[in-house]
From Swiss-Prot:
This is Putative pterin-4-alpha-carbinolamine dehydratase. It is an enzyme of class 4 (lyase). One of its GO terms (molecular function) is 4-alpha-hydroxytetrahydrobiopterin dehydratase activity. PANTHER family: PTERIN-4-ALPHA-CARBINOLAMINE DEHYDRATASE. Keywords: Lyase. GO terms for biological process: tetrahydrobiopterin biosynthetic process. It catalyses: (4aS,6R)-4a-hydroxy-L-erythro-5,6,7,8-tetrahydrobiopterin = (6R)-L-erythro-6,7-dihydrobiopterin + H2O. Belongs to the pterin-4-alpha-carbinolamine dehydratase family. The lineage of its organism: Bacteria, Bacillati, Actinomycetota, Actinomycetes, Mycobacteriales. Its EC number is 4.2.1.96.
Length: 94
């Protein structure tokens, strides 16, 4: 799968509520009402990621969870990352 151009990424971002491009990846941080709500969201995203065989990097800090998407094997952001960002929004709410 090809790495997306800057223009393609910029065109996709308006449809990805809460996501930004930072440090070569798509990133979104979400603050949950409680630590366990964040953990539950991570579990739901992890189950979906397993089914798609495309896994985000996930950072958990008390009630804040940050998802980062980049296709390491391709060396950049691909359509799979854009699709997974959209899927994550559907799972956790935009």
């Amino acid at each position: 799968m090809a790495v997306l151009t800057d223009e393609q990424i910029d065109a996709a971002l308006p449809d990805l509520d809460g996501w930004e491009r930072a440090d070569g990846a798509l990133r979104r941080s979400i603050k949950f009402p409680s630590f366990l709500d964040g953990i539950d969201a991570v579990r739901r995203v992890a189950e979906h990621a397993e089914s798609k065989d495309h896994h985000p990097d996930i950072d958990i800090r008390w009630r804040t969870v940050t998802f980062a998407l980049v296709t390491h094997s391709e060396g950049g952001i691909t359509q799979n990352d854009v699709d997974m960002a959209r899927d994550i929004n559907g799972i956790v709410g935009s």
